UniProtKB/Swiss-Prot annotation:
With CysD forms the ATP sulfurylase (ATPS) that catalyzes the adenylation of sulfate producing adenosine 5'-phosphosulfate (APS) and diphosphate, the first enzymatic step in sulfur assimilation pathway. APS synthesis involves the formation of a high-energy phosphoric-sulfuric acid anhydride bond driven by GTP hydrolysis by CysN coupled to ATP hydrolysis by CysD. SUPFAM superfamilies: EF-Tu/eEF-1alpha/eIF2-gamma C-terminal domain, P-loop containing nucleoside triphosphate hydrolases, Translation proteins. This is Sulfate adenylyltransferase subunit 1. Residues 202-204 are annotated as: G5. InterPro entries: CysN_GTP-bd, CysN_II, CysN_NoDQ_III, EFTu-like_2, G_TR_CS, GTP-eEF1A_C, P-loop_NTPase, Small_GTP-bd. Belongs to the TRAFAC class translation factor GTPase superfamily. Classic translation factor GTPase family. CysN/NodQ subfamily. GTP binds at residues 31-38, 110-114, 165-168. The gene is cysN. Heterodimer composed of CysD, the smaller subunit, and CysN. The lineage of its organism: Bacteria, Pseudomonadati, Pseudomonadota, Gammaproteobacteria, Oceanospirillales. Keywords: ATP-binding, GTP-binding, Nucleotide-binding, Nucleotidyltransferase, Transferase. It comes from Chromohalobacter salexigens (strain ATCC BAA-138 / DSM 3043 / CIP 106854 / NCIMB 13768 / 1H11).
Length: 474
């Protein structure tokens, strides 16, 4: 089955050790409806020999009832797992697949192309380092192509591979490929992505997916898989600005107090001076503890427990940063928000926000503008409908450190949660502290919360509950 089947059979320990040392690339496939995203992933798995025999037999059988490729095996069925997806021939949910080659491990997120599932695409893109954006060679750059490119850029994906698919349907025309490249480059001039590659391919026929195509001898670049194996993503991590959001305080006994969390940015070492935000108290790192023993250095993505020389007040939601770091503290910030719910975002409503490891109440007080994903122009808006993207002012209850998403995605992103249904209704990328933001911590309480608080104070006076309005200066 696999390119390493013989090694697995002969020496499983060597295989596991070799597999552990490979670096990992997370990437998404996106584009307009029926551009061939699922077929492309199926082709990657098939031609890199990462399909089990029973899987191949299953999709061969399914191709007779749900396939769209005639007598050929419909490789898209490897990814389109939902029954409704197979019946409609489209991708609805984000489908994840895993495979590896001799050089690298991969996690693929196949995201839906339909506009009403843009929120699913944003979810898949949030953890990716690279985006493969498919364009149908017959249709060129479409609205959804621009939308997905903009979302990928918004979420900080620095590497874009523009895969011009279905080249077999335009007779492998170099002129058509060059025309699409020029059209996309004109649009991409408005994006921030520093690394863009273009590959002409046919996922159905396998041209330029894993192996170079004989039908497109005019194309001198690498096949798609070679690009995925060689793209350099390690330098994308921020190793300068230390950020460790505290997930919980580990206190197994009286002689140990550790602060657990995933290092989001920077390099942490024992003996390093750090300070806690938002309190500003400073201390020195004593140990970096992990399940496998103490570390001399910790890097972004590692889950660690940190002990300090001093006993200072630290709790869930606080950040550990470098002692000399200048991180603004504010009760309001500017953010780009992708709205993910049928009920539109209307300024003034109170929501729950989850930012890094901190949970807090907040509200979107103003929509500065909505971005037209076709032209990237800004337009005035009073509300954000489903799948809309806008720049907003967010005010929160309390003071918190504010990170730009481009500095540290882990501490500069948040989700918006409806307080009544507990449904995630939006996702946001922080762009900095809001102009005129203070640290008053004021919040506009909903009527039912004020009434509920009053009932508790009336009927349970022994609880000594405080008036929520007085607590926040209302």
């Amino acid at each position: 089955m696999s390119h390493q089947s013989s090694l697995i059979a002969e020496d499983i320990e060597s295989y596991l050790q070799e597999h552990e040392q490979k670096d990992l690339l997370r990437f998404i496939t996106c584009g307009s409806v029926d551009d061939g995203k699922s077929t492309l992933i199926g082709r990657l798995l098939h031609d890199s020999k990462m399909i089990y025999e029973d899987q191949l037999a299953a999709i061969t059988q399914a191709s007779r009832t749900s396939g769209t490729t005639g007598d050929q095996v419909d490789l898209a069925l490897l990814v389109d797992g939902l029954q409704s997806e197979r019946e409609q021939g489209i991708t609805i949910d984000v489908a994840y697949r895993y495979f590896s080659t001799d050089k690298r491990k991969f996690i693929i997120a196949d995201t839906p192309g339909h506009e009403q599932y843009t929120r699913n695409m944003a979810t898949g893109a949030s953890t990716a380092s690279l985006a493969v954006i498919l364009i149908d060679a017959r249709h060129g750059v479409q609205t959804q192509t621009r939308r997905h490119s903009f979302i990928a850029d918004l979420l900080g994906i620095q590497h874009l591979v523009i895969a011009v698919n279905k080249m077999d349907l335009v007779d492998y025309s170099q002129a058509r490929f060059d025309e699409i490249v020029a059209e996309y480059r004109e649009f991409a001039a408005k994006l921030n992505a520093p690394d863009i590659h273009f590959v002409p391919l046919s996922a159905l026929e396998g041209d330029n997916v894993v192996n170079k195509s004989e039908a497109m001898s005019w194309y001198e670049g690498p096949a798609l898989l070679h690009l995925l194996e060689t793209v350099e993503v390690t330098h994308d991590k921020n190793l300068t600005d230390l950020r460790l959001p505290v997930q919980y305080v580990n206190r197994p006994h009286l002689d140990f107090r550790g602060y657990c969390g995933t290092l989001e940015a920077g390099i942490l070492r024992p003996g390093q001076r750090v300070k806690v935000l938002p309190s500003g108290k400073a201390s020195t790192v004593a140990r970096i503890v992990t399940f496998d023993g103490d570390l001399e250095e910790a890097y972004p993505g590692q889950a660690i427990t940190v002990t300090l020389d001093d006993e200072i007040d630290i709790s869930r939601g606080d950040w550990l940063v470098a002692e000399d770091a200048e991180v603004p503290l504010a009760d309001a910030f500017e953010a780009d928000i992708v709205w993910m719910h049928d009920t539109a975002l209307e300024p003034g409503r109170l929501y729950d926000l989850k930012l890094a490891t901190r949970d807090l109440a907040g509200k979107i007080t103003r929509i500065d503008y909505q971005t037209d994903v076709n032209t990237l122009e800004h337009h005035a808006a009073e509300r954000l409908a489903l799948n809309a993207i806008g720049r907003c002012r967010v005010e929160v209850a309390g003071t918190l450190p504010v990170d730009d998403y481009r500095v540290s995605p882990g501490t500069g992103s948040f989700i918006v949660i409806d307080r009544m249904t507990n449904v995630t209704v939006g996702a946001g990328m922080v762009r900095g502290a809001a102009e005129g933001a203070g640290n008053t911590g004021e919040v506009d309480w909903q009527a039912f919360e004020i009434e509920f608080n009053a009932l508790i104070r009336k009927h349970f006076p022994h609880w000594e509950a405080k008036d929520v309005r007085s607590l926040f200066g209302q």
